Curated annotation (Swiss-Prot):
Catalyzed reaction equations: 4-(trimethylamino)butanoyl-CoA + oxidized [electron-transfer flavoprotein] + H(+) = crotonobetainyl-CoA + reduced [electron-transfer flavoprotein]
Any Gene Ontology biological process: fatty acid beta-oxidation using acyl-CoA dehydrogenase
Protein name: Crotonobetainyl-CoA reductase
Source species: Escherichia coli (strain K12)
The organism's taxonomic lineage, starting at the top: Bacteria, Pseudomonadati, Pseudomonadota, Gammaproteobacteria, Enterobacterales
Main function: Catalyzes the reduction of crotonobetainyl-CoA to gamma-butyrobetainyl-CoA. The electron donor could be the FixA/FixB complex.
Pathway note: Amine and polyamine metabolism; carnitine metabolism
EC number(s) stated in the UniProt entry for this protein: 1.3.8.13
Amino acid sequence: MDFNLNDEQELFVAGIRELMASENWEAYFAECDRDSVYPERFVKALADMGIDSLLIPEEHGGLDAGFVTLAAVWMELGRLGAPTYVLYQLPGGFNTFLREGTQEQIDKIMAFRGTGKQMWNSAITEPGAGSDVGSLKTTYTRRNGKIYLNGSKCFITSSAYTPYIVVMARDGASPDKPVYTEWFVDMSKPGIKVTKLEKLGLRMDSCCEITFDDVELDEKDMFGREGNGFNRVKEEFDHERFLVALTNYGTAMCAFEDAARYANQRVQFGEAIGRFQLIQEKFAHMAIKLNSMKNMLYEAAWKADNGTITSGDAAMCKYFCANAAFEVVDSAMQVLGGVGIAGNHRISRFWRDLRVDRVSGGSDEMQILTLGRAVLKQYR
C-alpha cells in the first residue's frame, strides 16, 4: 500500500498550508467561538480554493477528487487549527441534492457554491426522538391540495443561518403505520420559529430548536421519494460520522503538536519537561492513538472511494476517533498545565469541541450498538 499523497493531493495540502499561514486565523476562530458566530470569511476562502467541489462529479463542474483526497485536506486543516466541524455540508451537501433533489431544489442549493455561506441542513432530532429516530412526532398532512408541517425539532445544527432545511416527518394520515418522508423547507416560510441554543463546544456552528406551526408546503417540496426518509438519512449519517472522525483526528493532531512544542521549551527543575519520563509516556500514548486514527481513517476513505464502506466502518471511525482524540487533547492539556486551562489557549476550545462530538452526530453508545451488529452480521 502506498501511503504517499499523489500530486493533486499534495497540491491541495500545500494550498491549505498557504491559506492557514496567510493571516492570524486563530484570532478569528477565537472570536467566532466566543460569540458563537459562523466563520463565513474562512469558509469562503476554502470555497475559493475549490474545497466545496472536491466530491462533486465532473459532469456538474466538480473535481470528483474522492474521499482519500478529502481526508488529506481535512486532516491538514484540523492539524493547523481550523474548525472543520463547520464544513460538514461543504463537501457532501451538494451531492446529496444531485442524487435526491428535484432540479428546482438542486438549482437553489448549487447557487451557494463558492459563497462560503451555509446552505442547508437536515432536521431530524426532536425533544422525544434522539437516537430513537423512529419515535419522531413531527407530521405532514395533506389538506386541500397542500401539505402542512407541524411539530418541533431540537439540536439542529446550522439552522440559525441556513436558508433551507430538509425536515424528516411522518405522514399524519397513517399514525398506525408510519410513513417517513423528507421535505425541502424554505426557512423564510410563515409558521417557522427558530430558537438558538447555547452549547459547550462546536460553538461556531449554531444549534437551534425549530417549531413548525401549519407550515404550508407543496408536493414539489418533497425531498426524494415518499416513504424513503429513513433510507436516505442512513447514508447521510454514515457520511457525517466519517467527517466527524476526520475532524477529531485533525483537532487532536493540532493539540498534540502544540503540547510537544511546549514540552520541549518549558523548563522546570533545570530542564525541559519533555525530558521527564512521565511526560514522555503521555506523548507515546498520544502518538499511538493518533497513528491508529490516521490509518483507520485512510482505510475508510479508500473504502468510500471504492464503494465498499459500511455503516459499521463509519461507526467504528466515529467511536474510536471521538474517544481517542478527546483523550489526546486531554493529555495535551495536562502537559500544558496552567497555560492550557487559563487565558486564551486554543486547546480549551479543542477540549470543549471534542467532548461534544462524543454525543453529537451519533452518541458513543449508538456507535457501539451499530458496530456490534455489523460485526456479528458478517458471521451469520
